Amino acid sequence: ESILDILEVKARAGLDVRLVYDDVGCVSTLPAKFYKEIRARGIKCEVFNPFRPIVSVVLNNRDHRKIMVIDGHTGFTGGINLADEYINRKVRFGYWKDTGVMLKGEAVWNFTVMFLQMWSVLTGSTEELQVIPPYQSHSYYKEPFESDGFVQPYGDTPLDHETVGENVYLNIISQ
């Protein structure tokens, strides 16, 4: 069973399953109009920066983030791409290990907001951004989450003129 098959089962069961992919980054690995196949499976799908075979400065305008949010409570991020060559099933680029991070609890809310912000840009609708609820604990997680530190996922985008990533790094360096 592939990840796509599992997502289809969840979407058909009534869960809100959404996918955003960077078309320029997938131009050599996914079929043209891949989003139509995804939507036919009942999965909501939007394409970031649809590929157009012309030389343009927007070819470098990419969204390389990997964000997965499950139930608004568990999130995954990191550098891992979803393809056989990244799990050493197929040798294409050599062998390496990449990092993936799982977060649980309130920090995941930031991933939800980042995803919905991009979704809003791609769909042209701000409706969902107006109703993002604050983080809510789920009843099936009995134990409270505890930590010695502070986790604050953040996002940066070329779509605005704010230098969030640069500011975060400069603040860390200046500590």
Language model features with spans:
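Charged, low-complexity intrinsically disordered terminal segments
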Residues: 1-175
